[in-house]
């Protein structure tokens, strides 16, 4: 019997919008529980992803990007999610993009906890050709905050991920596992399905569609043999509907097909997915509407 104590705890993955937090979280867990797109602020909720190793259990909290430019109800809500996560977790992983330090990165620094539990992760290091450039970039950041450790990674190429996990594990408190060994997330499957559909929307029409778009699962009927899902895509304006549909419905057909395929992989059975569009004017700037649509 091993004398090594078991460690378990919560790990917040934070950073400015579109810096690679969800890609990193998915890579560490080894499964897709957070959606990814080129569009900033794709992650809106606090997502818990779970990884269990022989002597540790990591509960990763993938947070929305901390927003400093816009002050609408949704952005205020997402910033509350970030600040709450920072206050509650055992370890903070602050993700920055190699070679790209912005005002958004700098404005997050005062919110970071004391150094004993803060790790700086420099993502996308495969895009930096010279080591001296990377060293100079990191040196400027650590001069502004006393990080406990610095780990350069490439989530896409799986570089340095084990080293990052070891650094996190060393800072987790001793304790019993919080979840079963095979648990990947504490979010229900219908939540993940809604997120997968939203990801497809942002990937296909994100450049044309504003942020006032969300997905609500209105029907979820699962049997041993198959799953039937009815999903409502909520937009803010009538003009958003034709963007989503595309000429002859080609956009929506592709969005639904790709989402259905991903959901089928998730539940490991055939899926019938019905998607329709509803206009709810100004929902993203009303806190009551955000709560009605399942935002924290």
Swiss-Prot record:
One GO location term (cellular component): cytosol
Region: G5, residue numbers: 153-155
Compartment annotation: Cytoplasm; Cell inner membrane
Gene Ontology BP terms: ribosomal small subunit assembly
Domain KH type-2, first and last residues per copy: 205-281
UniProt-annotated stretches for the region G3: 62-65
Era-type G domain boundaries: 7-174
Function according to Swiss-Prot or TrEMBL: An essential GTPase that binds both GDP and GTP, with rapid nucleotide exchange. Plays a role in 16S rRNA processing and 30S ribosomal subunit biogenesis and possibly also in cell cycle regulation and energy metabolism.
PANTHER family registered for this protein in UniProt: GTPASE ERA, GTPASE ERA, MITOCHONDRIAL
Name listed for the protein in its UniProt record: GTPase Era
Species, as recorded: Bordetella petrii (strain ATCC BAA-461 / DSM 12804 / CCUG 43448)
